[in-house]
């Protein structure tokens, strides 16, 4: 082979190798940006994600009965989480659920009330509350992390005490239930919209070893710890409103959770009143 032909072949090989490396690099960059970039706040989530895609991550804090903080872990283990990229470790909780909401104990009633008709209703309410207060809250909330605030779609949980206003009945119990169910665990989040508090309104799904995949909003409705969302702004159901209303009806007819009360003020009514 002549020297000129040899040089031409080498140049062609170098060009092919260069194009291949450039293409591979661009593909890796594209893949990382599209599938492995961590979203650290609500505004990081691209519009293309909303209503179409699910995000995987860990619940690091639960501050209320219908919202929590979500640490995004794109790609899971295959995305390097736990071996290349650090995952926040939870701190074990040494307090019981009742201590976490200490004022709930003060809502107990005097023993001599059994002679009154009201005692029966109060006993039923207290019994309903106690089953939630006994739930295990395994971890403490982790704060000051790059997390996305998540608001559960389609439901409203009873309000807890805020800004000097008293808590609604079952507000603390809803918080404990949610902490027991998801705090420190991995969940899937489907972003739907952003509310006025810059929270990501989302449908949330988690795995239960005894029941498979669970819709978190639906499970709260089933246990009578939330009502179907009544507001006209940021109303999101992800095409599950009829199902949510059906299970709310079942919980109400069976007097589960907050529905055991004879007189009940919805979270929406409570917020309007105060």
UniProtKB/Swiss-Prot annotation:
An example Gene Ontology molecular-function term: endonuclease activity
The organism's place on the tree of life at top rank: Eukaryota
Subcellular location per the Swiss-Prot or TrEMBL entry: Mitochondrion; Membrane
Domain TNase-like: 53-261
GO cellular component terms attached to this protein's record: membrane; mitochondrion
Keywords tagged on the record: Calcium, Endonuclease, Hydrolase, Membrane, Metal-binding, Mitochondrion, Nuclease, Transmembrane, Transmembrane helix
Membrane-spanning intervals of the chain: 15-32
Documented EC number(s): 3.1.-.-
PROSITE patterns the UniProt entry points to: TNASE_3
Active site: 151, 159, 199
Membrane topology recorded in Swiss-Prot or TrEMBL: Single-pass membrane protein
Family: Belongs to the LCL3 family.
Protein name: Probable endonuclease LCL3
């Amino acid at each position: 082979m002549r020297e000129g032909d040899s040089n031409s072949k080498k140049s062609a090989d170098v060009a092919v190798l260069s194009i291949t490396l450039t293409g591979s690099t661009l593909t890796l960059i594209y893949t990382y940006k599209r599938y492995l970039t961590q979203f650290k706040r609500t505004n990081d989530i691209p519009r293309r994600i909303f209503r179409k895609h699910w995000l995987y991550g860990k619940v690091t804090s639960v501050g209320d009965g219908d919202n929590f903080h979500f640490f995004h872990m794109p790609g899971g283990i295959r995305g390097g989480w736990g071996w290349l990229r650090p995952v926040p470790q939870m701190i074990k909780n040494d307090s019981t659920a009742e201590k976490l909401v200490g004022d709930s104990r003060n809502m107990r009633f005097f023993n001599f009330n059994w002679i009154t008709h009201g005692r029966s209703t109060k006993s039923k309410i207290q019994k309903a509350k106690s089953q939630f207060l006994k739930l295990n809250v395994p971890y403490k909330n982790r704060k000051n992390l790059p997390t996305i605030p998540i608001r559960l779609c389609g439901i409203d949980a009873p309000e807890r005490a805020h800004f000097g206003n008293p808590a609604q009945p079952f507000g603390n119990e809803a918080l404990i239930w949610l902490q027991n169910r998801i705090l420190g665990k991995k969940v899937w989040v489907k972003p739907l919209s952003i509310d006025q508090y810059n929270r990501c309104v989302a449908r949330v799904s988690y795995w239960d070893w005894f029941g498979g995949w669970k819709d978190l909003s639906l499970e709260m409705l089933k246990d009578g710890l939330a009502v179907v969302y009544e507001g006209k702004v940021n109303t999101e159901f992800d095409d599950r409103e009829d199902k949510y209303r059906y299970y709310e009806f079942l919980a109400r007819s069976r007097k589960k959770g907050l529905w055991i009360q004879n007189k009940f003020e919805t979270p929406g009514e409570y917020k309007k009143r105060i």
